[in-house]
């Protein structure tokens, strides 16, 4: 009974505080590292946001440059096709041969003998030339029309795709809301990369197709 009464009973919710007689010390490397690192979580989040925006801008600039190059090549092909069509449709001037005065021209029209009618040359050569001329014109017009349709498809890429614009906006908004936890925006970043890859794949398909 005496032993039980000698220990004070701890009341519910009581706290024990232990104090150390020796001072707490940190290594010099840790102290130097903490003093030299002045960047806060907010500053790191802003740096990450700027880096992502720069990468997005570079990717869009690369797509626009590639599109401009393709448009220039198509316009060049259209110009060459038009020049070829004009050259093919232009009538060729007949060759004129000059002979000295008093010489005999074997290519001159023959004077029919008496009692024989003069038969003109068959128009087969003229018809073949006309058919070839028409075929060349149709093929050139068909190629020009095909290139024009492709060119109109390329011009649509000048405007930013809605999916890419939305994904970019979501990434920026997420980084602003989670400035101290930028890694929480991995879903938005992955979706943006997916939209950019889809846009680039469609661009390549339009060029190859």
UniProtKB/Swiss-Prot annotation:
Induction: Down-regulated when grown with elevated levels of potassium chloride. Pfam families: DUF1690 (PF07956). Keywords: Coiled coil, Membrane, Mitochondrion, Mitochondrion inner membrane, Stress response. It is found in: Mitochondrion inner membrane. InterPro entries: DUF1690. It comes from the Eukaryota. It is a peripheral membrane protein. One of its GO terms (cellular component) is mitochondrial inner membrane. Residues 48-86, 127-156 form a coiled coil. Its main location: mitochondrion. One of its GO terms (biological process) is cellular response to osmotic stress. The keyword Cell membrane does not apply. Signal peptide: none annotated. Component of the MICOS complex, a large protein complex of the mitochondrial inner membrane that plays crucial roles in the maintenance of crista junctions, inner membrane architecture, and formation of contact sites to the outer membrane. Involved in osmoadaptation. Component of the mitochondrial contact site and cristae organizing system (MICOS) complex. Belongs to the MICOS complex subunit Mic19 family. This is MICOS complex subunit mic19.
């Amino acid at each position: 009974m005496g032993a039980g009464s000698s220990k004070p009973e701890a009341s519910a919710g009581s706290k024990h505080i232990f104090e150390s007689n020796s001072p707490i010390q940190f290594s010099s490397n840790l102290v130097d590292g903490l003093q030299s690192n002045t960047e806060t979580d907010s500053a790191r989040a802003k740096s990450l946001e700027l880096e992502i925006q720069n990468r997005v801008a570079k990717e869009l600039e690369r797509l626009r440059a590639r599109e401009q190059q393709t448009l220039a090549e198509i316009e060049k092909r259209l110009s060459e096709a038009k020049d070829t069509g004009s050259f093919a449709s232009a009538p060729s001037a007949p060759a004129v041969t000059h002979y000295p005065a008093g010489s005999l021209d074997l290519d001159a029209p023959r004077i029919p003998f008496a009692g024989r009618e003069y038969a003109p040359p068959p128009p087969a050569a003229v018809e073949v030339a006309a058919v070839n001329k028409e075929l060349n014109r149709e093929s050139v017009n068909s190629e020009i029309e095909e290139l024009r349709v492709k060119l109109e498809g390329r011009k649509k890429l000048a405007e930013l795709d809605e999916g890419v614009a939305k994904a970019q906006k979501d990434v920026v908004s997420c980084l602003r809301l989670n400035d101290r936890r930028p890694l929480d925006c991995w879903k938005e970043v992955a979706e943006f990369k997916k939209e950019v890859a889809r846009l680039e794949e469609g661009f390549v398909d339009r060029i190859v197709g």
